[in-house]
Amino acid sequence: MRAFDRSRAKRGEHWTGPQMSRQQFARDSFGIFAAQIAVMALGIGTSVITARTLGPSGRGLLQLLTIFPATMSNFAKLGIPVANVYCIRRRGARTSAVASNSLLLGLGLGTALALACWLGRGWLLHTVLRGVPAVTLPLVLVLLPFVVLQTFFLGILQAEQRFQEYNFQQIAPTLFGLVGMAVALLWLRAGLIGAVIVQTAVVALVTVWLVLRVHRRTPLRLAWDGPLAKEMLGFGGKSYVQTLAATLHRQIDQYMINVFLDPAQVGLYAVAVNLTNVLLKIPDATGTVLYPRLAALEEGDAHRATARVCRNTLFITAALGVGCLLFGPFGIRVLYGPRFAGAIRPMLLMLPGIVMMALYMILTRNFTSRNRQGVNIVAAGVALSVNVGLNCVLIPRWGISGAAISTAVSYSLAALMLLVVFVRESGHSVAETVLVGREEIGGYVRHARGLVPGAAGE
């Protein structure tokens, strides 16, 4: 049986321009956004528990141990998650073959990465993980194969547009994490070690569930498909540098704060980052649904869809950003207490960059869907370099506020670089891409009135 069946697209299994359903797109996006809102609410609950029980320093150490597996796993992903979507949606590859290759690659790459980190544990514990108890490192390294596998198989769910399962996989670890942290920190008083054990157990269990769900519909085989692997690695290799640079761009500031300052400052900064990143749930939700659809569209249709999604996503994100600006300081004081008041200024300083990142997250999907990852790589690489350079200057001078300024500048730069290229290649103007029209605003007003009892009939 062939790994590739390019006739699938011709039989209508792909999402084409004339068949494009805006209602279905809206439903899928809303479903993922609703799941992200649930994740946000549960995540804030977990964040409050960990912050109030561990304090700024302990919260900072937990933040480093939480983001470390996600950061390191990007060195081993090789672009496979986006390659899975591309191969299934555009190339017509059999899902079972893609999943089987992903299983073998994920286990092999994740295990090799864990061993490499263990061998370099001395350097890690004296630099980016400075202050982290050595006993917690094995618990975190065990997670690496699971984290790699999870991202590979999420790409398969995304390609098959199995968004209900995708949403459950997003919500489940946050829900289990909230319950686990409450038990470990509030009841058992297990401290940082208990929190890390909960994190490891939750990620491992959810990953096993995800693999079994994929296996149920598309049986996995311990067989290696060489030609398909070459296709996956070939496309993924182009996305690898892009994904790695983008992830480092988002997370390297927290490691640099730990190097230049101390874990307590990481804890304060983590609160600011986690609250502002709530805004990015919107472009993440729409981008997750948009990418597999763009991968099956002709270029002109893809550009039109991208411009429409960009301007609406940017509008909603900016509106919520204003809400964060007005009520965020009050929320930090009430939820986290006076010990975390130092998170307020960096939260406000990074907000403009967070809004611009919404634009970046949508535009990257357009370039990746057209096999133009080189544009994303340049933007992410330049922005990462600017971010690191600014952090080296501003963190020693202005502390975590300097890191927030660096984030705002580099995020905005990355988004503007992609916008310039998109406008040039698509023929859409800047206004068409970033500004909602009068009819679209009218639609938002009608929807808002529909949510208010008695307003719909006025």
Please report, for each region that a protein language model flagged, where it lies by residue:
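Signature of the first transmembrane helix
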Residues: 2-5, 23-81, 110, 114-118, ...
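Interhelical loop/hinge segments that connect adjacent transmembrane helices in multipass membrane
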Residues: 7-22, 164, 188, 192-196, ...
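Interfacial segments at transmembrane-helix termini and the short loops linking adjacent helices
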Residues: 17, 57, 121-140, 326-355
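Transmembrane helical elements of multi-pass membrane transporters/channels
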Residues: 27-44, 173, 177, 195-210, ...
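Membrane-water interface segments that mark the loop-to-transmembrane alpha-helix transition
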Residues: 27-40, 64-65, 74-122, 135-138, ...
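Helix-loop junctions and terminal segments of transmembrane helices
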Residues: 74-93, 159, 272, 276-300, ...
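Membrane-interface junctions at transmembrane-helix termini in multi-pass inner-membrane proteins
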Residues: 87-90, 146-170, 296, 352-379
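Hydrophobic alpha-helical transmembrane segments
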Residues: 134, 138, 167-216, 382-386, ...
